Amino acid sequence: MPMSRPDSSVQLLSDYSLRAHNTFGFDVRARVAARIGSPEQFASLARDPRVAGLDALVLGGGSNVVFTRDFDGLVLLDEIRGRALAREDDDAWYVEAGGGENWHAFVEWTLAEGMPGLENLALIPGTVGAAPIQNIGAYGIEMKERFASLRAVELATGEIVEFDAARCAFGYRDSFFKREGRGRFAIVSVTFRLPKVWAPRLGYADVARELAARGIDASRASARDVFDAVVAIRRAKLPDPLELGNAGSFFKNPVIDAHAYAALRAREPDVASYPQPDGRMKLAAGWLIDRCGWKGRALGAAAVHDRQALVLVNRGGASGADVLALARAIQRDVLERFGVELEMEPVCL
């Protein structure tokens, strides 16, 4: 797949503002930053004495990070572009995209090219390269279900390494790259397997309701119909980061065992929950937060969104420390009332 900017030379940018590179809009600065347009540029930095010894952070869309201070290291801005059908067989298309490609634009492109399968993941903020790190998911599907492989540069050596699904060790909003591999690799491209036999994923009531509101019979819904429905739902529920700084869902939906769930339901009969294949129950974190009275509330300029309790927002002038303080107050209240620990989705730095 062709990659943008084949030149391996890298310009370093000192005292670089990251305000435009994180969706909360925090005005923090990086000691050094570099715009990366090719795998070769990532590799060249491994041998560059100008950045030797600096901690490195790869940023795509900045939609999964909370900066609580300036970053005293090297920020690598992933701008590797390109998308193409890499190959196909009788069963599936294998589509490769550069790590710096906008995720939503990539999903829309696959549909335009007649290759459905990612439509439930429409309008998730961020880049293609960030999708495996977080194992993004929405409306009944996770990225790992469509994942084939990825290529990543090991930052210490400049070596390009291939990862299959097993090596990525995907979990719920989790992967190897959020744990042991954190800070060690930069994802340069991802290949997705999109099955040629397609059926809509309509397990979430919101999607079925939106299709019905549009006069579409769910049994006859096309991939584009599902895409449009998901986009409409997300736009109605979630604020645009360009208008109100946020990082999407701030907390993971907690999963508890059957015994803990039975005890919780005895106290809270209407708790919003979803059964899991292993017998455990996934709780709706937004419901827990709302029940604690946090929806629409604020601590200074950091607030809980008034339409979606899972989303924390920067109303203007908030710092990462403000958002983190709000998140911890919410975690404390949910734990005290329900005995359930909420885990943050974004990385806090």
Curated annotation (Swiss-Prot):
Its cofactor is FAD. Residues 26-197 form the FAD-binding PCMH-type domain. It comes from the Bacteria. It is found in: Cytoplasm. It holds the Pfam family FAD_binding_4. InterPro entries: FAD-bd_PCMH, FAD-bd_PCMH-like_sf, FAD-bd_PCMH_sub1, FAD-bd_PCMH_sub2, MurB, MurB_C, MurB_C_sf, Oxid_FAD_bind_N. It is an enzyme of class 1 (oxidoreductase). Its main location: cytoplasm. Pathway: Cell wall biogenesis; peptidoglycan biosynthesis. One of its GO terms (cellular component) is cytosol. GO terms for molecular function: FAD binding; UDP-N-acetylmuramate dehydrogenase activity. It catalyses: UDP-N-acetyl-alpha-D-muramate + NADP(+) = UDP-N-acetyl-3-O-(1-carboxyvinyl)-alpha-D-glucosamine + NADPH + H(+). Keywords: Cell cycle, Cell division, Cell shape, Cell wall biogenesis/degradation, Cytoplasm, FAD, Flavoprotein, NADP, Oxidoreductase, Peptidoglycan synthesis. The active site is at R173, S249, E345. SUPFAM superfamilies: FAD-binding/transporter-associated domain-like, Uridine diphospho-N-Acetylenolpyruvylglucosamine reductase, MurB, C-terminal domain. GO terms for biological process: cell division; cell wall organization; peptidoglycan biosynthetic process; regulation of cell shape. Its EC number is 1.3.1.98. HAMAP family: MurB. Cell wall formation. Belongs to the MurB family. This is UDP-N-acetylenolpyruvoylglucosamine reductase. It comes from Burkholderia thailandensis (strain ATCC 700388 / DSM 13276 / CCUG 48851 / CIP 106301 / E264).
